[in-house]
Amino acid sequence: MNALIQSKVQCKKPELSETKCFKMHIGKDKLNCSNLEVNGKVMKTTNSEKYLGDVLSSSGKNDENVQMRYEKGMGIINSIMSILKEISFGQHYFEIGMLLRTSMLVNGILFNLEALNNLSVAQINLLEECDKILMRRMFDAQQGTPIEAFYLETSVWPLRHILMARKLMYYWTIIHKSESELVKEVFNAQRDFPTEGSWLSEVQGVLQSCNINYTVDQISKMSQAKFKNIVKERIQSKVLVYLVTLQNKHTKSENLHLDSKMQPYLRTEVLSLSEKKLLFSLRTKMLRLKANFSSMFGNILTCSVCKEVNSIETEFHLLNCSFIKKDKVLVNEMQQVAYEDVFSDIAKQTKVVKVFKKIMTIFDKQKTLGEKQNEK
């Protein structure tokens, strides 16, 4: 073995030394391991080593890699938000935001993960935490905003489903590789000698869950475009089931639905960026009102400004609040809208969000004044 290593060194002429070369043992039995050498010196033994940006571990675990991707993702989020704040994208703010999410965050933290196996649920959740943070910052959303709301409104896939699609497309790529390539030889070995926990067994599980029941021979005869369309269609169905499952656990997102495109109000030129963010808060019932955060206010939900008995501080109440109605100009506008308009067409959404914008200005001002008086 040492002679082979030395031969490779002489042929390739790389700058190798004992500081650059390590040996890593995989498995439990170390009795038959030889002492490998490079340039006449014994290689050092290591349990983990960074190679081409990823950490190779003797345990086969992905903890270090996932943690590195998470930390990288946090840096990418700051870069994306800097771009969105420093450059005025007008009505295209959210569209550009989703493009930056895909090109920078998704590609940055999911790069080559389709080739890894045994990613745990906890590890996938950690990577998705980056996505959640980006979404919240992009929408200026409260911490408790249901995560499915972001995906339903923007019509993008959660990271776990993007990773599924990438694994399946990598599966197609391997099938179409030459039999002489190393990756194809490994693939064939995993197919001929099935092992629980192997990359192929994991992909087969994804295929089954997506109801893609084609054989290797059938897939080998498919074009990339055809297989990609099949994958996209099946993953889209899984995304819908996943988001609806989450939605059923949260009443705040119950009126939202998944569309083929981003919601029109996020793309329109009629609304300003602040109005779009306000409309999102209205649609997800995440305005800073007592009824939306009842536990935070000890279930004391009386309106902070009118303080009427039996009044409950909700979006519905604000449209009928006696204190807000003291503004005689605004009261006429309030009578022309309903809370349900936030789920209607652009025309009605525009009217209702502009009314709520004025309402919240009065509400916040009076609430702040009341809090200062209470402090005295």
Tell me the role of every PLM-derived stretch.
Residues M1-K8, V55, R69, I76-I83, ...:
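Generic, well-ordered alpha-helical scaffold segments in large soluble proteins
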Residues Q123-L126, C130-D131, R136-S281:
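Acidic catalytic cores of enzymes that act on phosphate-bearing nucleotides/polynucleotides
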Residues I83, I87-G90, L246-K376:
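Family-specific functional microsites
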Residues N2-E15, S322-L330:
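Classical protein tyrosine phosphatase
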Residues A3, S7, P14-N47, M68:
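Short, conserved micro-motifs composed of acidic
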Residues G40-N117, T173, E181:
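Basic, alpha-helical interaction scaffolds
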Residues V42-T46, I87-M104, T145, E153, ...:
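Structural motif
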